[in-house]
UniProtKB/Swiss-Prot annotation:
Keyword Ribonucleoprotein: yes
Name assigned to this protein: Small ribosomal subunit protein uS12
Gene label: rps12
Classification of source organism: Archaea, Thermoproteota, Thermoprotei, Desulfurococcales, Pyrodictiaceae
Subunit (UniProt): Part of the 30S ribosomal subunit.
Coiled-coil ranges per UniProt: none
Gene Ontology biological-process entries: translation
GO molecular function, one term: structural constituent of ribosome
Record organism: Hyperthermus butylicus (strain DSM 5456 / JCM 9403 / PLM1-5)
Role of this protein: With S4 and S5 plays an important role in translational accuracy. Located at the interface of the 30S and 50S subunits.
Xref: Pfam families: Ribosom_S12_S23
């Protein structure tokens, strides 16, 4: 007769809990969270937002079944020099953003910090341009200052 794999009884709780904790290390998300690997490889280094300089404007083709050119910019982050691609939201948003502008970027809000919707490889979006909100500029409330 084979033995039971898990203990049972009134005083088995500690043993059961320890066993569960041991098996959690085989889960990918748990391991990434506990070892702090997201901060290590994240261009924003765990911060919610980051400032950067626009290097160039790029058009990213949308994934199937959509057909569009999503307006994005290549941004070099000030704090560590890494280059990321950021989506420019809004109608005419790319007309406002020029090369060498200083922009503030944040996560685009995709699942588990990844890209969102049909934009492949783009994890960030532009929030402000030269210290002024992109939305305010597009709505006509404020003017973009010249750098």
């Amino acid at each position: 007769m084979t033995g039971k794999k898990s203990p049972n009884g009134l005083f088995a709780a500690r043993k059961l809990r320890r066993k569960r904790l041991k098996f959690r290390w085989s889960e990918r998300e748990f391991k990434i969270r506990m070892l702090g690997l997201k901060k290590k490889y994240d261009p924003l280094e765990g911060a919610p937002m980051a400032r950067g300089i626009v290097l160039e404007k790029v058009g990213v083709e949308a994934r199937q079944p959509n057909s569009a050119v999503r307006k994005c910019v290549r941004v070099q982050l000030i704090k560590n020099g890494r280059i990321v691609t950021a989506f420019v939201p809004g109608d005419g948003g790319l007309l406002v953003v020029d090369e060498h502008d200083e922009v503030l970027i944040e996560g685009i809000g995709g699942p588990r910090g990844r890209s969102m919707g049909d934009i492949p490889g783009v994890r960030y979006r532009v929030v402000t341009v030269n210290g002024v909100s992109l939305r305010a500029i597009l709505e006509g409330r404020k003017q973009k200052p010249q750098r």
